[in-house]
């Protein structure tokens, strides 16, 4: 459509990021149509039709300098972003515009960020395991290829570091394409991630879409959809794509801000009344079809460490595996601080992961659960009051707890110890030896921050 044919309207009200625009009554824009401010790059997205030709829009960019009477043009279509191979190796904003100063993105294809979820008969569930090289995840909450994974945790327990390690272990080994959506996170982390990818020579396989903390709520609300649209295009071309989102909570938070600005009545804890619908629309699109797969890893901030908060609670139901990071475990110095009793996966089924893996996972969890039950008795009466069986359970549980820790590649610069990738077979063998009692003679310090069980034996020799 040529610019001359675009219907024009005038701004009639500005309240923060919400702009009301009046159009001729017979040519009101549709919901989700993109409007462009005349003589500027600023885009507005229609959210509500108020009647009498007035539409309420959300501003995708700073609303500084806007005033009543300015001319706005209706593009008569939703926000569309470039998709396909030209997006790889580039950093883009919510509108798909490059922000890495490396020239324009020459893409033949564009795609609307608002798409319908694939039809039920197009879906293709998978039970194939995706090895991560992180012991606690591979053992307790294994990932499925084409599945959805959530990393849940409060502030500062290691969500982003865990996600970076997963990207390091999976994206580098994967060989396919990845899309990273930075939703309302720190700009520094986005910058670090870009350089991390560049240094490891996988930048040409990753598309980066950022709507960071300092950006208006409209950008943070839509940037997850922009990244997802790019991932969907690769999937529909028959590829297996990895989709990383950091952080889904900020998507919800941006929705809360926008909802309040639009004048909707808040629901529980101040969240938007449409929380479940917005989350569902996003999550139902992150799925694998008969053409290709999207394997997604999403970091989910947990406000005040409360997993029953409406935002994380709404996210739980959409996931195949949940990795719960615990402040109590982090305070013991055990990293990754994954809670082996809270974390779950739908893959934990003997028909999927095999009888051996299943039984060892359950035995490890039973041992840790027993230790948890005995902790109060130990605190009051001491270890001496326990029965010999319970003493043995506690000793093994403490070894398991330490063996679940692991040095990360992405944390080498902070810790000084080289990162370890542990194959699934080695993980199962190591934990089998501990629960079978083959390591009862080793000191528990030998299991802390090692890779395989053989390294624990080596470390024990040095300690003794």
Curated annotation (Swiss-Prot):
Keyword list, A-Z: ATP synthesis, ATP-binding, Cell inner membrane, Cell membrane, CF(1), Hydrogen ion transport, Ion transport, Membrane, Nucleotide-binding, Translocase, Transport
Name listed for the protein in its UniProt record: ATP synthase subunit beta
Annotated family: Belongs to the ATPase alpha/beta chains family.
Subcellular location as annotated: Cell inner membrane
Binding site for ATP: 153-160
Alphabetical list of CDD domains matching this protein: ATP-synt_F1_beta_C, ATP-synt_F1_beta_N, F1-ATPase_beta_CD
GO molecular function: ATP binding; ATP hydrolysis activity; proton-transporting ATP synthase activity, rotational mechanism
Domain of life: Bacteria
Catalytic activity field: ATP + H2O + 4 H(+)(in) = ADP + phosphate + 5 H(+)(out)
Protein role: Produces ATP from ADP in the presence of a proton gradient across the membrane. The catalytic sites are hosted primarily by the beta subunits.
Major place of residence: membrane
Membrane topology qualifier: Peripheral membrane protein
Keyword Signal belongs to the record: no
Subunit structure: F-type ATPases have 2 components, CF(1) - the catalytic core - and CF(0) - the membrane proton channel. CF(1) has five subunits: alpha(3), beta(3), gamma(1), delta(1), epsilon(1). CF(0) has three main subunits: a(1), b(2) and c(9-12). The alpha and beta chains form an alternating ring which encloses part of the gamma chain. CF(1) is attached to CF(0) by a central stalk formed by the gamma and epsilon chains, while a peripheral stalk is formed by the delta and b chains.
One Pfam family cited in the UniProt record for this chain: ATP-synt_ab
EC number: 7.1.2.2
GO cellular component entries: plasma membrane; proton-transporting ATP synthase complex
Key word Ion transport present: yes
EC class: translocase
């Amino acid at each position: 459509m040529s610019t001359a044919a675009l219907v024009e309207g005038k701004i009639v009200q500005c309240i923060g990021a919400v702009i009301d625009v009046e159009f001729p009554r017979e040519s009101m824009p549709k919901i989700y149509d993109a409007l462009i401010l005349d003589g500027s790059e600023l885009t507005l997205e229609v959210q509500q039709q108020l009647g009498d030709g007035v539409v309420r829009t959300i501003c995708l960019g700073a609303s500084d300098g806007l005033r009543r009477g300015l001319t706005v043009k209706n593009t008569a279509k939703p926000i569309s972003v470039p998709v396909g191979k030209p997006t790889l190796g580039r950093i883009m904003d919510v509108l798909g515009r490059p922000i890495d100063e490396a020239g324009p993105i020459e893409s033949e294809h564009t795609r609307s960020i608002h798409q319908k979820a694939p039809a039920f008969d197009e879906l293709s569930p998978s039970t194939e395991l995706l090895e991560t090289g992180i012991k606690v995840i591979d053992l307790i909450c294994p990932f499925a290829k084409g599945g959805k994974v959530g990393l849940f945790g409060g502030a500062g327990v290691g969500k982003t570091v865990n996600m970076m390690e997963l990207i390091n272990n999976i994206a580098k080994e994967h060989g396919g394409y990845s899309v990273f959506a930075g939703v309302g996170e720190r700009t520094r982390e986005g910058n670090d991630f870009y350089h991390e990818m560049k240094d490891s020579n996988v930048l040409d396989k990753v598309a980066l879409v950022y709507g960071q903390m300092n950006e208006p709520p409209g950008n943070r609300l839509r940037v997850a959809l922009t990244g997802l649209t790019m991932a969907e295009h690769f999937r529909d071309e028959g590829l297996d794509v990895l989709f990383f989102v950091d952080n889904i909570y900020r998507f919800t938070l941006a929705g809360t801000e926008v909802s309040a600005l639009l004048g909707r009545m808040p629901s529980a804890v101040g969240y938007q009344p449409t929380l479940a619908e917005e989350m569902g629309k996003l999550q139902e699109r992150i799925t694998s079809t008969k053409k290709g797969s999207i394997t997604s890893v999403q970091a989910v901030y947990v406000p005040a460490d409360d997993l029953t908060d409406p935002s994380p609670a709404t996210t739980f139901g959409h996931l195949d595996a949940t990795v719960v990071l615990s402040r109590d475990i982090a305070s013991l110095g055990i990293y990754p601080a994954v809670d082996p009793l809270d974390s779950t996966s739908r893959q934990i089924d003997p028909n999927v992961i095999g009888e051996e893996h299943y039984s060892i996972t359950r035995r490890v969890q039973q041992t840790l659960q027993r230790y948890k039950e005995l902790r109060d008795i130990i605190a009051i009466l001491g270890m001496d009051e326990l029965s010999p069986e319970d003493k043995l359970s506690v000793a093994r549980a403490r070894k398991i707890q330490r063996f679940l820790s692991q040095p990360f590649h992405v944390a080498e610069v902070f810790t000084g110890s080289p990162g370890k990738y542990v194959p699934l077979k080695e993980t199962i063998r190591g934990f089998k030896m501990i629960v079978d009692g083959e390591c009862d003679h080793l000191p528990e310090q030998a299991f802390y921050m090692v890779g395989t069980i053989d390294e624990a034996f080596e470390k024990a020799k040095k300690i003794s």
